[in-house]
Amino acid sequence: CHLMAMFVDDGKAFGTTHMGGEGAQWAGMEPFVEKEHMFQNIGDGTFFHSGSLALRQAVAANSHLTYKILYNRAVAMTGAQDPDGGLDLPELTKYLKAEGVKKVIITTDDPSAYNSIEKSRWAKNQIIMHRDDIIEAQKELKAVKGVTVLIHDQSCAANLRRLRKRGLVHEPKERIFINEAVCEGCGDCGVKSNCLSVQPIKTEYGRKTQIDQPSCNKDYSCVDGNCPSFIKVIPSEKEDKRALPNINIKASKIPEPKKLNAKIGNIFMLGIGGTGVVTVNQIISTAAFLENKKVVALDQTGLCLLYTSDAADDSLRV
């Protein structure tokens, strides 16, 4: 996820490194450049996988560096699994202190969630701040010489949306809309939220802004924008449960499909995230495997693990 910050063309994020080498390149560059400090993004999965060694190297080199660990409990690269070998937040703060990190600050969307955790489980003098104060937290860490860490604790929004869809976690009822007749298209809501669901729309009165409801994560940070055009809507309690069609057909009565004469069959499927392309590929692959056929499959999901609007294409050879 932190690599995708480079897609934003504002020059604030730059440079790439191999997985697990985050921060190591700055330790080598630092003595030869005028810049005194650097922020280094890293995900929790990468940190627990191999990035912790790069942090240890930065501490050994006494680099003036702040790691920003995105603690979102999801490996977005491979399907939002839990990071292997991960530590919970209190254990992580103690680990960082033991490695020689000078200061650790946690930012989160819900600081009250930590009230039930015993203080003895945290590292000493632990600082917890609301995510709205993340800029102040970064300034505070930058002022400390040596290696510091900002841990941003917030669940992966894309995975949270999937869990809500499956009914595994609570879904907020309130929805946010923008009255296009009032909106002036200033874009402040997009700046405040940095959200992909805040999208421009062309109207007869010029460029306005809308909230894309299917992709909305119900984070509500867009309403922090200085704008009177927001509308908060709570839908009725009546649930729209779409029943599956009642298809009363026995499998034995389904005619066999026309078989190809070729010994090798190639299938190519194209879609977008959420349309079931990967699922269909897996079903066909499993069916062929059960018939003792050799199967070669390739899922190219791109960024559709994060954004349902991104392309997914699957190749299958049986």
Q: Where are these predicted regions, by residue range?
A:
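Short helix/loop capping segments that flank catalytic or ligand/cofactor-binding pockets
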Residues: 5-8, 49-51, 58, 76-79, ...
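Short glycine-rich or small-residue beta-strand-to-loop segments that form or flank ligand, phosphate
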Residues: 41, 178-179, 266-272
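Thiamine diphosphate
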Residues: 6-147
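A short, basic/flexible loop-to-alpha-helix module at the beginning of a structural domain
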Residues: 248-264
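Glycine-rich phosphate/diphosphate-binding loop of Rossmann-like nucleotide-binding domains
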Residues: 277-297
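Iron-sulfur cluster-binding cysteine motifs and their immediate structural context
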Residues: 154-155, 160-166, 184-240
